[in-house]
């Protein structure tokens, strides 16, 4: 239900999101609490190799884990990309992958 919502830095839904806010909101709807930042989310569970990623796993990007998306299967993630862009699906390989975490 977040697909197409605008990116707003610091927003955690439901009308707008930043990348980590989207992950926090989505997992929160499933009753799982996540930390607020992508860096903290990268450490909020079990690390798994990309080859074992399942829908719902968090994929963090760049060496500083400054971006995060949610794996949805089929080599795709859903994420809130950047200001001026809406929440969308994109290839899991859109940026250099830092880690895959299963909350």
Residue spans of the language-model regions?
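Gly/Ser/Thr-rich beta-alpha loop segments that engage phosphate groups in nucleotides
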Residues: 6, 12-15, 71, 75, ...
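Catalytic cysteine-centered active-site loop
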Residues: 2-55
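Hydrophobic beta-strand signal
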Residues: 58-60
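Aromatic- and glycine-rich peptidoglycan recognition patches
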Residues: 32, 43, 47-51, 66, ...
